[in-house]
């Protein structure tokens, strides 16, 4: 069941990739993908290329994939391990969602962080109280880690 669904998503992704994202299996393992997300141009992540790993559970799509940033990113909803705080990867997951939609949601999270449900409270606090400092820090991390 899972592998059939994952194959279908891979075909759909190759046919119609989401804007500024790409994804596919690592080697021969269909349950382990790597994705790239281009930093949105209207965000401090602009110009960066962010690597993301995707691990599908055996009962996908009834359980969400595990998605994490491999590239360091300064963001209130992404911690130093790359874990992403995004409702659709947790309690809001639905089997109707696809990796394409997940990648687009991560892109929009880069543009519009959710400081009210932070994974890193200090960054969320900076985002709310000193937006200029947040944006310049996010920009310098992007240049340092995502433009190699």
Swiss-Prot record:
Example GO molecular function: ATP binding
A single GO BP: protein ubiquitination
Active-site residues per Swiss-Prot or TrEMBL entry: 85 (glycyl thioester intermediate)
Function recorded in the entry: Accepts the ubiquitin from the E1 complex and catalyzes its covalent attachment to other proteins.
UniProt similarity note: Belongs to the ubiquitin-conjugating enzyme family.
Listed name of the protein: Ubiquitin-conjugating enzyme E2 28
Keywords from the UniProt entry: ATP-binding, Nucleotide-binding, Transferase, Ubl conjugation pathway
Pathway annotation: Protein modification; protein ubiquitination
Lineage, highest ranks first: Eukaryota, Viridiplantae, Streptophyta, Embryophyta, Tracheophyta
InterPro entries xref list: UBQ-conjugat_E2_core, UBQ-conjugating_AS, UBQ-conjugating_enzyme/RWD
Protein species of origin: Arabidopsis thaliana
Subunit structure, as described in the record: Interacts with SINAT5.
Transferase among keywords: yes
Entry-linked PROSITE patterns: UBC_1, UBC_2
UBC core domain residues: 1-147
EC number annotated for this UniProt entry: 2.3.2.23
């Amino acid at each position: 069941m899972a592998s059939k669904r994952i194959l279908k998503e891979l075909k759909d992704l190759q046919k119609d990739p989401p804007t500024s994202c790409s994804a596919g299996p690592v080697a021969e393992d269909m349950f382990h993908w790597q994705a790239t997300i281009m930093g949105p141009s209207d965000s401090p992540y602009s110009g960066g290329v962010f690597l993301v790993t995707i691990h599908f559970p055996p009962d996908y799509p009834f359980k969400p994939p595990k998605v994490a940033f491999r590239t360091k990113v300064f963001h209130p909803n992404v911690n130093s391990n790359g874990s992403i705080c995004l409702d659709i990867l947790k309690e809001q997951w639905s089997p109707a969602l696809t990796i394409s939609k997940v990648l687009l949601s991560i892109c929009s999270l880069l543009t519009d962080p959710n400081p009210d449900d932070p994974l890193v409270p200090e960054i969320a606090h900076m985002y709310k109280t000193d937006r200029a400092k947040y944006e310049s820090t996010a920009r310098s991390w992007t240049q340092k880690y995502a433009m190699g």
